[in-house]
Amino acid sequence: MTSTAPHPPSTRSGVAHGPGPLGRLGTWVLDHRRLVAGVWALLIVGLGIFAPRVEHDLSGAGWQADGSDSVAARDLAVEHFGGNASSAIQVVVRSSEGSVLEGEGAEVVAEVTALLEDDPRIATIVPPQPGATLSQDTDTGVVLAGAGADTNEMVRAATDLKEELAALSTDTVEVTPTGSSLLWSDFNEANLEAMLKSELMSWPVTLAILVLAFGALVAAGLPLILTLAGLVASAGSLVLINQLVPVSIWAMNFAMMFALALGIDYALFLVVRYRAARAAHPGPEGVRWAVAQTMDTAGKAVLLSGLTVLISLSAVMLVPSPSFRSMAGGIMLSVVFVLGATLTLLPLVLGWLDDRINKFALPWSRS
């Protein structure tokens, strides 16, 4: 059986004692490569199945103070006024050729009402009422669709209904759904588009900076491995958590930012330290020693950094707002997964690559 305690290849190390706890973790990872790789593969694949649903399942709502008078008043409106609260959906029907109470306008209003009645998330439906939701010339009216579900579910209802409602428009009658639920639905879509666009722009730039920083293409790819592992695991976890408690879409936004930032920082610490240790102790036995030294030094700094971030963010969980708690929770999840990947997956990859970490090095770079 192979010992997990590496011995320095020469007396140049100046270290007479064995590796510390993190150093032993690093050598244990090297001795159990298949197990560690298998666990991470199962984790990423298992959670990755749910990750694509993150933008649809998570909600942009939740900007409220639980227990406040405003939330209590909204709940009373939902209970006693047929769901006619802030999360209700309003459908504006406007006719360019006469009243919405007769002719084609009335037909469209009836179609809007029928479509809303088929959705179980909609409570009481109120057609355009004179003096309230009907203009003086009767050319424009508002169909009120009360909220029959919580705010997050009403955002999903708005997402499902808005295209069907808009499709009821004719050449002379225009149908436009609106309200806070529609606002958050549109925001989620704009947020997804902006996030994808920003990632397409930032990742190539990030890779170029990493290549310059590490001096080699292979070494530059390691932070991206940590980032992807943390992102996929975080996204899948958020979707699963959302089945138990509502999670805001902001959680994924901040999780992505922190996963990228910490993935780069943590990988930079470990890769630079490992390359220095291997340069000081070349040879086959130097791999285990370099991993142990890297984990006992840079690994310790990374662990303390991650724990500090987690402790700092835990205070945000006390804020009585679902959105703020979701943001803190998303960041904490990304930190946990990136930290776990840094302390287990990265040592495995470093030991496996060894000198190949400098492959495709820049001509002017130095290890």
Where are these regions (language model features)?
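Solvent-exposed, non-transmembrane loop/terminal regulatory segments of multi-pass membrane proteins
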Residues: 23, 51-90, 94-96, 181
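Extracytoplasmic
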Residues: 71-72, 98-146, 163, 186-189
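Soluble periplasmic/extracytoplasmic beta-strand elements of cell-envelope proteins
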Residues: 88-92, 142-146, 174-176, 269
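Structural beta->alpha junctions
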Residues: 93-104, 145-153, 178-182
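Residues at beta-strand starts and edge strands
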Residues: 85-87, 139-141, 333
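Sec/Tat-exported extracytoplasmic proteins
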Residues: 81, 85, 116-120, 165, ...
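Membrane-embedded transmembrane helical bundles of large multi-pass transporters/channels
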Residues: 1-57, 122, 149-367
